[in-house]
Amino acid sequence: MEATRQYIDFYNEVRDVLASRSCPEMNACREAALQTFSRQGFPSPKVERYRYAKVEADFSPNYGIALAPLGGQLPPHCFRLAEAEPRVRVLYNNVADATDSIVCLNTMLSVDTLVVHVPRGVKVEHPIQISNILKGEQDTMVCRRILVVMDELSEADIIITDRAASQNRFLTNQVVEVVMGDGSHLSLYDIEETHLLCTRYSSVFVRQGRDSSLHHTSLTLFNGHTRNRLDVLLQGEGSEVTANGCVIADKMQHVDNNTLIDHAVPGCQSSELYKYVLDDNAVGAFAGRVLVRQGAQRTLSNETNANLLATRSARMYTQPMLEIYADDVRCSHGSTVGQMDETALFYMRQRGIDEQEARLLLKAAFITEVIESIPLESLRDRLHVLVDKRLRGELSKCEGCKLCG
């Protein structure tokens, strides 16, 4: 509870500063978040969705906390929450899980919210790129908030990237809320390429309307400790979601992906594919729950978690789950954990490929399926290059700076 008290005391010290720098919609949610956070504290591994995370240990170091509002020129269709339309502003904190302590801490301490609003019928021609660059002279915690509002029949690609430009310790607590109107289409990409001293808790909450489609891809290329949460509520008939993920981890890295796909109405489809390549002493975790509610007939759902362990010391925890309360459904789920195919290695070495290169090629081939599923061709091509560099160890040679490439 010491870490919990540390953040409560800090909030009480800076609440006036937060109020002066934020808009009314954000300030109105802080006290309720404080009450929930004070009552619950940081979740322990006994909390099912945090079973594989050491939350209190991650949040215990004495970080300085950034309290600066958004600055600089924003991309097209992007606004500060205070500058967004009133009907958009009221959606703040309307989709996120207000009972989750990590979300509540974000609600307490976030100074600003980046809004991406695509109006009705607009098809955004170029991807909207949101770059989060961690830089500072001291160990720093950053609370980030993003609200994406896709009006009816709108289309967009959004790329969120996390990079580190200095070698300090960083702790990121990010909450992304997505509201998708009827017939809207969104491809949302989350790419993490930081360093071993970075800890990230990212929570993405999506609410989909009728006939909407979401393609979400999470890629962890380099990190220290990452915990990604994805909750998707399919509340409009005919809505679809594809949620894919790719993890490359080595050294002492830890990556935990936790997903919930909630089929609340009939006639919806979901597909999940998460692949991990773990080397050295890396630890991976995947817990994916698909919930088919009563009355959600004609549901189609497929969930797969496949994992490649390149060493005997790497560890993977996998827990795909199906919870079905309807009878007219087609649902499947499964997971695999395996080591390098020695037969394939032998075959490649017989043809003149050295062992190191052969292992690299097998790792790349294993995760190609996730990269190739990305609809955005320019990003797909770029990620093939980044994955190759990552597997060759070229990204980790300058862990303090990820801006080149």
What are these regions (language model features)?
Residues 1-107, 119, 273:
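N-terminal amphipathic, basic helical "cap/leader" segment at the start of enzyme domains
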Residues 87-353, 363, 367, 371-405:
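Conserved beta-strand/loop scaffold segments within soluble protein domains that form the structured core
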Residues 50, 361-362:
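Residue-level "edge-of-site" marker
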